C-alpha cells in the first residue's frame, strides 16, 4: 500500500458506495430495479434556427407544445444577430420578444448562446455569419481553422486565438444583464463550443468538399496551430533530443514538428498508433478541453449569481468510420475526440452538463459507413454516468416510432436528465395542429417527464384530492386550451395523509377544467360535467355514492402547501420535541398567518425531532410560534420566533423560558433506549404505558421516571418511581449497538471510502480548519456517516450484505481524508460525524441486516515527528515509536522484513509494538471501539509492517473477525498471516484476475492460483477483489476488445461474475457499479455518483441475488470441472444446494460439453440464474454455449 507524506499518497481502503434513495427492491433475478430517467427529467423542443416572422403561428405552436406536456423551448441566441452593429453594441430586442412569447405560453426557455455561424452545415436553413467586426480584432491565421488541404474555416472562432475568451465573456455579461428579469423562465443555459454549437473542430464541412461518410479532416494547419503543437511537445519532453528519443525521429529543429501531412496516410501507415501520433491526437483534443474550461469559467462568472441554473455544452455524435479497420475512429479523432474519458472529465471539472446526440440511431457497422451510433451513445453515456456528469440528449435526424423507442431505451438506461427534440416544425404545423411525430414524442419521451409543479411562469392551480381512488389521475386543460391525453396525469401523494396533490401552470388562463379517474377508465361523476378550479389552492372531496364532489378554497387542514419545493426562499425548522405532536403557526415575515393552531409538524429523520420546510416566497424570514394543537403555547415572552432562510434547529426553553434557535440541522446525537417504559402523565401513572425511543434523555439502569414537562420545556428524569407507580418498570438498558455475530464467509462486501462516498451533512465539511475542497483530489471532499446512512438502500438493493468503511479515527491534516493518518485513536474524525452518528450508522445498517467492517491502522500514526511531536495522548511518548527511518525501495526489494516491520512507511510514525505499554493500549483501544460501536469486523491496514506476534494478541483482544491487508503477490507470504488473523485480502488472486480477465490471458492461471490455497488457513474467508483504492481501477488497466480497446465492460462483467460466485468473500469497491475507470491514486478515489439504473449496478445486483439465495455460492465446497485457455467451469455444493458456473473468457462464442458433476443425476434440469435458458444433464454431461465474455450460473 502506498501512502503520502506532505503531498504524498496514502493508501486508503474502501470499497463501497451507495445511494440516493433507490427504490428498487431485489426480490428475484428478474425483479431488479427497472431503468428510469433521472428524477428531474424534462422533455424540450428545439426552436427554429432562423428568426420568427409569423409570431401568431409561432405562439400557436408553443401552446400546442405546452398542452402536450413539453417543458421548454430551446433557442439559438445568435451572436451574429445581437452584436452585429459593432463591438459591445448589443441589441437583444428580438430575443426579449421571443422570451415573452414563451412566457405567455407557460413554457420554459432554454437559450443556447450560439457563438458559431449558421449556414453550410447539415440541417442549416439560415445564413447567420459571425459579427463582421470580429475580423479587425486579430489575424485570420489566429482566428480561423485550416484543414489538411488548406481550406480556411470561419464557422467559429479558433480556441487558439487569445481573444476568444474575452469576446465570449463580454457576450455572456450582456446576456445576463439583459435577461435577469427572465430568470423565472430560464431553467438552464447552453454554451456553443464550436461549429454547429458543438465542442469540436469543423472537420466535416460540406462547403470544404466533405460528404458523408467521409473521414473529415484535421484542422491544425494554421501557423498558430502548428506553433501551439510544437510548444506543447517541447513543454512535455523538455528538449528536442527527448522528443526524438520518444518518437524515434531525427529532427534538427522544433519547426520540423508538424501535424500529419497526409491525413489518410496517418491511418493507413499506422502513424495514429505511434508515439508521435498519440501525442498529436492527445494535444489536438487538449485544445478543445482548454476551450471548454475557458467558456465554462466565463459562463459561471456571469450566469451563476444571476440565474443560478445548470449550464451545459454539447459534443457531437461522430458515429461513422468508428470500426473501419483502415482508419479506426478516424472521424472522431478529426473532430477532436481521442479520449472520451478525459474529455468528459473536463465537463466534470468545469461543472457543465453534457448534451449528446444521435440517441435515435442504430448501429450498422459495415462498409462504407462503419456507423456505430448506438455503441457511441452507450460509451459516452456510461463514462458520464461514472463521472457524475449530468446527461441531456438530442436526436440527430427527424425520427419516427422506432427512433423514439430507441431514444426511450437510451434515456432510461443511462438516467438522462432531459431530452430535446429537433425541431418544433417536425412536431407542430404552423396552424398549431400536431404532426404525426408528436404522438410518438409524447408516448415515448414526454411521458417520462416529471411534473413541473412549481416552476411555471403563468397562473397556477393547486389541487388537493381527498382520495376516493387510491391512485387518482387528473385529466385537464387550461380553460379554452387543449386536453391532456386520457387518462391524464397521475397525481402524487400530498404531504398530508389521505390526499393527492398537483400544481398545474395554466399560462394566461384563469381556470383549470378537470375530471378525475383511476387510470382504468373509472371516472368521477359530476353529472357528466367537468370540474372547474380557479387559480390558487383548492381541495376536492369526491361525493358519496356517485354524487358530484365538492370543491373548497384552500388546502386541507394540516397541509403544508409551501412544502412543495418551490423556487423561492425556503425555511427548514427542526423542532426538538417538547410537545409530542407539535404545531407551528407561522407567516412569512410581513405576510399572512396560517389559521390557528397552524400546521402539524412531521417527525424528522432524526429521532426526537419534528420538522417542516416552508416556502416563504421573497421574504427573508419566517415568523412562528409553537403549540400542541390544544391551545398550549410555547412561551417567548409573548413574542414570536424569527427563522432565517436555510435550516435551523429550535430547542424549547426550560421552565417556561424562551427557547433557543441555532443554525443548521441537529447533530443526530440521540440515545436509543432499547426497551424503555415510561408514564406519559405523572398524574395518571396507572394509565397506559408506552414504549418508545427517548431522545437526549439520560436514564439510570434500575428504576427511573421520565416525564415531558408542560409548555414545551425540556424533559426531566428522576431516579425513582413516581408515587403510586409500578416499582418494577422495565427501562431496559441504554446500550451501544451490538454486533450481528456475522458469519463472514457468507457475506458480500461493498467497500466505501467514506470521504468520497456521499456528503450527508455539509455542516461538518470544514471540521478542524481542514476545509473540504472538491477540486483537489488529495483533500477532504465532504463524505460522511450520514451520507452512508442515506445510501444504505442503494447498497442493500445491490445485494450487498456487508460494508467496509475506511478508518474513523481523528486525523490532523488537510490530506488525511482517507483516515490512515491517525492523530487521536479515541475520537471520531469530525469530518465524518460524531460517535453518535457512527453508532446510528451501525444500528441502521444492522436494521437492514448489513454487517459493518471498519478499517483500522495499528502499524503507525500520522507523521507528527519530528517538529510537531506525536499523536494525541496516550500515544504521545517517544518510546511508543520506532525511530529507524523510512523503509526504502531497497528494503522492499531485498525483503528486509526487520526494516519492513520497524521502519516508517512513507514517513508515517511507526508504532513500537515491542513496548508493552504501546501494545496494551492498542488492545484496550480496539476493545473500546468495538464496545462503543457494535461493529462486526475489522480490516487491518498495512499488516505486513506489523510484527506477527502482536497481530495474534490483537486478534484475540478484538475477539471479532479480522481481515488483513498484506500487499504482496506471493501466496505463501500472504497466507502465513492467516495463522495470526482470521483472513487476508487475496492479493495473489487479484493479480491473477487482472491478468486473466483484464488482459485476456489463459484461464489456466486460475487453476494454478487455486493450487496455492494450501497456504491459507481457510481460503473460503479470503477477501477476493478486482481492484481497490490503492491500485488502478479494473477498467483503467484492462486491455479492452482487440481493435476496439474502449470496449472493456465485457471483461469487467466476466471478472465480476467470477468474483461473486467463486470461493472467498467478494469485495466490490465503490464506483465499480458506475463504471469508474480512474488510474493511480488519487484518480481511483473519485466522488461517487448514484445511478441505480446503471447496467453494471443491475448486473452486480443480479449476481448478488443469486449468491444470497444459494448457500453453495457463499461458502460451499468448490470443485473444478473444466479448464482450458478460454473456458473455465466449477461446481459448488452445500447441504443439497448445487451450483455450476461456466465462464467464457474469449471474445468469441464458445461451446463445451462438460461432465463428471457431483450429486446431479441424469435428467436433472438446471436453469441459468443470470438469464432464462436451461440445460439438462444427459449421459452425465451438459453441453453449453456461452457468448463472448459471458458467465452462466446453473442451479436446480
UniProtKB/Swiss-Prot annotation:
Record keyword NADP present: no
Domain of life: Bacteria
Family: In the N-terminal section; belongs to the glycosyl hydrolase 14 family. In the C-terminal section; belongs to the glycosyl hydrolase 13 family.
GO molecular function per UniProt: alpha-amylase activity; beta-amylase activity; metal ion binding; starch binding
Protein name (record): Beta/alpha-amylase
Skewed-composition ranges (Polar residues): 544-553
Family matches, as PANTHER family: ALPHA-AMYLASE 1, ALPHA-AMYLASE FAMILY MEMBER
Keyword Signal listed: yes
InterPro entries: A-amylase_C (IPR031319), CBM25 (IPR005085), Glyco_hydro_13_cat_dom (IPR006047), Glyco_hydro_14 (IPR001554), Glyco_hydro_14_CS (IPR018238), Glyco_hydro_14A_bac (IPR000125), Glyco_hydro_b (IPR013780), Glycoside_hydrolase_SF (IPR017853)
Sequence repeat intervals: 455-558, 565-668
Cofactor(s) named in the record: Ca(2+)
Disulfide bond entries: 118-126
